[in-house]
Amino acid sequence: MALVPIVVEQTSKGERSYDIYSRLLKERIIFLTGQVEDHMANLIVAQMLFLEAEDPEKDIYLYINSPGGVVTAGLAIYDTMNFIKPDVATLCTGQACSMGAFLLSGGAKGKRFALPNARVMIHQPLGGARGQATDIQIQAQEILKLKEMLTRKMAEHSGQPFEKVAADTERDNFMSAVEAMEYGLIDKVLTHRDIK
């Protein structure tokens, strides 16, 4: 199990200690790190809903460093980002690949960022099926529907034509932060802090 740093704050009532992620949550910062999967998605959704309840007018900051993961788990996060009232600003630190890139591009327009050495990778969804031929056919149809929907949404977020995004996601397509900005997946490369 990884150790999580603890920070201590002085208050009028004495000292209070927080794990670093809880302290950053007070600043409306959520970390999406590692593989996107159901448990992690549920925690991120819960944090977004909590922050909306705390203040529906203030932005939420989603810091992403992820190789991607389960499409349906990522869509739970994506749908919540769009469902809640606060804008969700996204910031790539390290990498945003696959579903990580999709979530990065799905941040509020004008509030999608990456650090200078971040890497972004887009591709079509991955899947595998086993079982009877009919079951494999059902799975294939489902992944094709997901591919079409994800491509359409990424085209919408990037401003690129659907056909271009479809072609560009046929294989792993790696981009620097500047290339991701030129493609329309992010709005700005941050070289110094100018957001909270």
UniProtKB/Swiss-Prot annotation:
| Highest taxon above the source species | Bacteria
- A matching Pfam family: CLP_protease
SS bond list: none
A biological process (GO) of this protein is: protein quality control for misfolded or incompletely synthesized proteins
Q: Which InterPro entries match?
A: ClpP, ClpP/crotonase-like_dom_sf, ClpP/TepA, ClpP_His_AS
Where it sits in the cell: the answer is: Cytoplasm
GO molecular function, one example? Answer: ATP-dependent peptidase activity
Please name the HAMAP family in this protein's record.
ClpP
Family affiliation:
Belongs to the peptidase S14 family.
Q: How does it assemble?
A: Fourteen ClpP subunits assemble into 2 heptameric rings which stack back to back to give a disk-like structure with a central cavity, resembling the structure of eukaryotic proteasomes.
What is the designated name of this protein? ATP-dependent Clp protease proteolytic subunit
Origin species, per record, is Actinobacillus pleuropneumoniae serotype 7 (strain AP76)
Q: Gene for this protein? A: clpP
